[in-house]
Amino acid sequence: MENKNVYSLVVAILNRGFSDVAMSAARNAGAKGGTVISARSSGLHEEETFFGISILPEKELVLILSTEETKAPIMRAIIKHVGIETEGGGIIFSLPVTDVEGIKAFEDFSKKQ
């Protein structure tokens, strides 16, 4: 049985302060909106300290629910404006979404399918 995903979750992990740029680019590429979450980086790099206090790099996560058709243009727009080679330092990826409830625009789209 084939499971065709109609939706994707586009995830962008950005340096703090670049979520507005990412959302503007995504909207211009077809996104209807998104969610921004504040985060801290934790990984391979040693923590910086300032007067003995650990300072972790601040990040922002941008989450955008998109249709499969708008996923690639949204990702390309975000990469162009805040990708890894820009000051935004963005890492962008997508995940398949199997079910969506409670979002009118997506519910209307599903009824057309």
Task: Name each region found by the language model.
Residues 1-113:
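Positively charged, small/polar-rich N-terminal and surface patches that mediate targeting and assembly
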